[in-house]
Amino acid sequence: RCKNNLRQIGIAIHNLNTSTGFFVDGGKDWWSARSMQGSTPRMAPHQNWGWLYQILPAMEVNNLYHFQPDYKIRRTPVEGYFCPSRRPPSVLGGLRAVNDYAGNGGVCGQGGGLSDWGEGKSGVIVRGGYTPKVTFETVTDGSTHTILVGEKALHPDHYNLFSISDNEGYTSGWD
């Protein structure tokens, strides 16, 4: 089922790329409210929330994408964002629904993590608000040789804890 979830996520991202001409992004930051234009959520590069939020309509979770208020969206887990062999859909501390998948944000420095200020801009799903839109043309190694999304690295002892690499929830787009 994990492979199927990754396949569905990949198809959702590609479908959005086909309709917009660019890839979803990693969102701007974890503390910002969702970007709206009237009552409609905005898309990358104008959406503060991350790629897993941005693909909800293509994952057939359109009702959650348009739901109000924001805090209820943050607390609602999406079944397709969890690998069943890892853990069930989870909400950490009753605050944020987490996920088991990570987007390719690019290379990172010796510390191993991407800064929330836009470093590591060489990936496909980069931080929003800091870099230009990523298109198939800007993927210099070619899309067949580039990882888009994968299972995120997380120690099993941290699956249901506030681990630094698993504490922001799927709406932030970078954890």
Language model: regions and residue ranges:
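Internal low-complexity, small-residue/proline-rich segments
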Residues: 1-175
